[in-house]
């Protein structure tokens, strides 16, 4: 069995391993390919603070996010803290990389460490997939991965130099409101031409609001249909378990100002 593992990791399949398929697996693979929501809800595992490794049970707004990502090229999401926005995003990117060959995906965050953490969560979900759903692994480290189908994922900080010179099918910008305005503007002026040159390339921006900046401008323009982004807004009360009692307790343990900043989008 060790002959089939990537660098001795029993949870990863190396490249050029012949897969023997059952009829049921062929049907299931086809269903997963066609339906990202089915794939995520059936096969993606995430780490819960209270329960450890568990299936990803999606909230209604998370399902809406995935559907919007899948059907549109440009999406911008405004969500409160700790709402599962990043988990939703990496689950979609996992599906996209598995079932679309030769795609390049960039996971970009305001800090490189945050981007690497997001990639790490995607890698954990990947390791917990059945082997017949996995692509063979070509390379696998803290900053990037490459699969046998030619798809690659890069994790980096959001900067013009991060993806300059490369062509990307999906650019995911996490907590974009926290990227300094000058960096955000340089990034878009450098990267947008390569994105706009494709017909199926995607830009997905997900953030908690943070003042008047490029995220604010893109969000406002999306709401008023001055750009091509599809806006998705989630209120803290849409997250199960968050009610008025939770709000009052959170304010008591922090402050009303902090609550308004992080949860009252």
Go through each PLM region and give its residues.
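Phosphate/NTP-binding elements of NTP-utilizing enzymes
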Residues: 2-265
